[in-house]
UniProtKB/Swiss-Prot annotation:
Lineage: Bacteria, Pseudomonadati, Pseudomonadota, Alphaproteobacteria, Hyphomicrobiales
EC number: 3.4.21.88
Active site per database record: S161, K199
Keyword set, alphabetical order: Autocatalytic cleavage, DNA damage, DNA repair, DNA replication, DNA-binding, Hydrolase, Repressor, SOS response, Transcription, Transcription regulation
Gene designation: lexA
GO molecular function, a single term: serine-type endopeptidase activity
Annotated site (Cleavage): A126, G127
Protein's name according to its UniProt entry: LexA repressor
Entry-linked CDD domains: S24_LexA-like (cd06529)
Organism annotation: Brucella melitensis biotype 1 (strain ATCC 23456 / CCUG 17765 / NCTC 10094 / 16M)
Oligomeric and partner information: Homodimer.
UniProt function note: Represses a number of genes involved in the response to DNA damage (SOS response), including recA and lexA. In the presence of single-stranded DNA, RecA interacts with LexA causing an autocatalytic cleavage which disrupts the DNA-binding part of LexA, leading to derepression of the SOS regulon and eventually DNA repair.
Family annotation (Gene3D superfamilies): Umud Fragment, subunit A, Winged helix-like DNA-binding domain superfamily/Winged helix DNA-binding domain
One Pfam family per UniProt: LexA_DNA_bind
Amino acid sequence: MLTRKQHELLLFIHERLKETGIPPSFDEMKEALDLASKSGIHRLITALEERGFIRRLPNRARALEVLRLPDSIAPGLSPQKKFAPSVIEGSLGKVASVQPVRPAPAPQNSEAPATVSVPVMGRIAAGVPISAIQNQTHMLSLPPEMIGAGEHYALEVKGDSMIDAGIFDGDTIIIKRGDTANPGEIVVALVDEEEATLKRFRREGASIALEAANPAYETRIFGPDRVHVQGKLVGLIRRY
């Protein structure tokens, strides 16, 4: 599990190596992560090396090699630099009452729509569960290929419990509405009919586990009648 800064630095090094074949300098890494001193970069590199994500090559200046990336990182994903979240305000209530908009099918023999409108329903906790969304705030226009078929809605992420899955506070996530999920999928889960959270779905025997992607948060176990899946993650939007 990586912290947000470790995650950002690993991506920055990976992208620089992919683009130029040369690792970034400590000054470049410090600037990219907006840190005050290079000592912070030294600590992050040591932590990444201890966790087996990178290694320092002997007898070569600035020599770093990326050994692996977290499973959640798709190839080509760019690191955050001075990230400024796009905050989407929303009122709070039950997810269960959300009525997402289903895009109307295009008429036969006509061109497919350039965009699909998806309702933004407010906020969802990626941390300790909070009361979840009820009222639509506005619409997002998205390319159809981003979401595919089905009913969808969007939420603003609040919290840091999913950072090792590449989901950060302030991100906007796209959820495909549904009441089932496979183990390992990231879902919007309604707990006790009143609290919603964004977590990875697991099964522990007859119980349901809601698993964070941040070692600072414990996996929470519930009886099957206490958790209702409200949809699963299919996309993410981040503004820089």
